[in-house]
Amino acid sequence: MKNITDSFVSLGHWPFAGSFGFNTDILATNLINLSVVLGVLIFFGKGVLSDLLDNRRQRILSTIRNSEELRRGALEQLEKARARLRKVEMEADEYRVNGYSEIEREKMNLINATYENLERLENYKNETLHFEQQRAINQVRQRVFQQALQGALGTLNNCLNSELHFRTISANIGMLGAMKEITD
């Protein structure tokens, strides 16, 4: 019980200039205000954040769908290329005497071009996914920061009024007068 009484007595005592110590006063350290602000941010920001993430997820899914459609198109091109390859192989059997090496070179060029096209489309899909993920993360960070800043400014504006300013100034003037009397 003595510790509680001592802590209330120490609330009225201000240390002299040049000293420092651990401030155990909950009201002076703004723990209550900070916890209220964080609680409000978490309560109201949760819905907005989930909406942002849902929207971003939908965009990413649509990008994935588009990439899959591009992949299907590339696979169709691959099938067409394989059909052409089979046709070329049949012609190769007919023209083996005339130019087997020329047909083989054309076949390899066709296969290489098709695989390069598939690799390019796969790289494009991966780059698009990575870019969309980074953009989503950056937008979520920016929105959360803006909402936190707006909430903090709103809380500060609601808490600060002229009566509070007047009481704070009066208390500080009284303490300065008391300190002056002590030093005199």
From Swiss-Prot:
Pfam families given in the database record: ATP-synt_B (PF00430)
Name this polypeptide is given: ATP synthase subunit b, chloroplastic
GO CC, any one term: proton-transporting ATP synthase complex
Family: Belongs to the ATPase B chain family.
Membrane topology, as annotated: Single-pass membrane protein
Miscellaneous comment in the UniProt entry for this protein: In plastids the F-type ATPase is also known as CF(1)CF(0).
Keywords: ATP synthesis, CF(0), Chloroplast, Hydrogen ion transport, Ion transport, Membrane, Plastid, Thylakoid, Transmembrane, Transmembrane helix, Transport
Gene it is expressed from: atpF
Chief localisation class: plastid
HAMAP family, sorted: ATP_synth_b_bprime
GO molecular function, one term: proton-transporting ATP synthase activity, rotational mechanism
Biological role stated in the UniProt entry: F(1)F(0) ATP synthase produces ATP from ADP in the presence of a proton or sodium gradient. F-type ATPases consist of two structural domains, F(1) containing the extramembraneous catalytic core and F(0) containing the membrane proton channel, linked together by a central stalk and a peripheral stalk. During catalysis, ATP synthesis in the catalytic domain of F(1) is coupled via a rotary mechanism of the central stalk subunits to proton translocation.
Tree of life domain: Eukaryota
Assembly with partners or alone: F-type ATPases have 2 components, F(1) - the catalytic core - and F(0) - the membrane proton channel. F(1) has five subunits: alpha(3), beta(3), gamma(1), delta(1), epsilon(1). F(0) has four main subunits: a(1), b(1), b'(1) and c(10-14). The alpha and beta chains form an alternating ring which encloses part of the gamma chain. F(1) is attached to F(0) by a central stalk formed by the gamma and epsilon chains, while a peripheral stalk is formed by the delta, b and b' chains.
PANTHER family: ATP SYNTHASE SUBUNIT B, CHLOROPLASTIC
Transmembrane segments: 26-48
Subcellular location: Plastid, Chloroplast thylakoid membrane
